[in-house]
Amino acid sequence: MSVEDTQPLITHLIELRKRLLNCIISVIVIFLCLVYFANDIYHLVSAPLIKQLPQGSTMIATDVASPFFTPIKLTFMVSLILSAPVILYQVWAFIAPALYKHERRLVVPLLVSSSLLFYIGMAFAYFVVFPLAFGFLANTAPEGVQVSTDIASYLSFVMALFMAFGVSFEVPVAIVLLCWMGITSPEDLRKKRPYVLVGAFVVGMLLTPPDVFSQTLLAIPMYCLFEIGVFFSRFYVGKGRNREEENDAEAESEKTEE
């Protein structure tokens, strides 16, 4: 391989390193700003469960280091989540030079809507799902059983739900993207509604903790988001593939002229 051939690769690697460093710095800066409030952040996240606990019940720590490390771990996760727009922007800045003009126009709204829907999904989990799920689980405890949740177990439980709802709320973006690329169409998706409904419950079973209540609370919004995605996808059907064909045709004609 000649020096000229390695130059573009080295340039890309330097650019990738720069973008990765920017992502890491953004996470560290946000973490350092929030770490002082680590216990307050954990209290905020645990509030939906604490409100549903019977009188006199509290959360417990079964590991010696849990009271220190669990809030710190949560704060780091929050830092990652809050850094998502910066991370997505760095990804966009890295791949943008390789995209066509019409693709670049789509990416910005795609990144904004993806971030927004992810945060909306997490907010839905916190304000709607958590109170209902924890109320249901606390009230179904057998008689004589005192509900005292371990703080580390609770963190794992809620982060799984946060991620499940955040990712599931990306369904409209995924559908619009698939239709834009010409892989599917709104008509095909409408025909598959029964399968999508069953699939939503299967995904709910896989992504949420093993209780029917959480699975249902994820599956129903997922199906509603599917319908929203189908509605908006009709404005983007096949546009990406058509543009690619036009670009290929233009490139072919330029080669012929040469």
Swiss-Prot record:
UniProt xrefs under InterPro entries: Sec-indep_translocase_CS, TatC
Keywords of this entry: Cell inner membrane, Cell membrane, Membrane, Protein transport, Translocation, Transmembrane, Transmembrane helix, Transport
Subcellular localization, as worded in the UniProt entry: Cell inner membrane
Segments passing through the bilayer: 24-44, 76-96, 116-136, 157-177, 193-210, 212-232
Domain of life: Bacteria
GO cellular component: TAT protein transport complex
Residues in the Periplasmic compartment per record: 45-75, 137-156, 211
Function summary: Part of the twin-arginine translocation (Tat) system that transports large folded proteins containing a characteristic twin-arginine motif in their signal peptide across membranes. Together with TatB, TatC is part of a receptor directly interacting with Tat signal peptides.
Stated family: Belongs to the TatC family.
Protein name, per record: Sec-independent protein translocase protein TatC
Organism: Escherichia coli O6:H1 (strain CFT073 / ATCC 700928 / UPEC)
